Amino acid sequence: MTKYIYSILLSFIMIFAFVGCSDQQSAQGVSDNEIVLGMHTDISGPVSSFGKYSVEGAQMRIKEINDAGGIHGRNLKIIAEDHQYQVPRAVQAANKLLNKDKIFLMVASLGTPMNNAVFESQAEKDVPNLFPLSAARSMTDPLHR
């Protein structure tokens, strides 16, 4: 099951990496040799045991992808930010990932209120949110702009 999920993740990354990019313009977080992913999760708060393992799992899978040659010769890099399961910290973390780190996509971010709080910012930057760790309908229903 895990391999299936990561295969889907890899497929989405490959699709998003090249859709809408021309020779003169590249997507945020995509360079000739790297694709930057971001996640905000609970690393030191009340559900840190879950957050820490999600970061470690993502890092392990990304290492496997990079060891196999990356995606079209590009290595993946993931930046994980700790929101301590607090909405204001999640907003700060997402703003850093979007504006300073210039991530290509958000992946496996933990928490319904945290994901809901940053959806608008991500939409403004055209940064997809793949596999949010939440079961809320707002994570699966289409976003109406």
Language-model-derived ranges and their functions:
Residues 59-71:
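Flexible, small-residue-rich helix->loop connector segments that border functional cores
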Residues 30, 47, 71, 137-140:
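Short clusters of hydrophobic/aromatic residues that line enzyme substrate/ligand-binding pockets
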Residues 102-145:
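Extracytoplasmic ligand/sensor domains, especially the bilobed periplasmic-binding protein
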Residues 30-31, 35-59, 81-87, 110-111:
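Extracytoplasmic "Venus flytrap"
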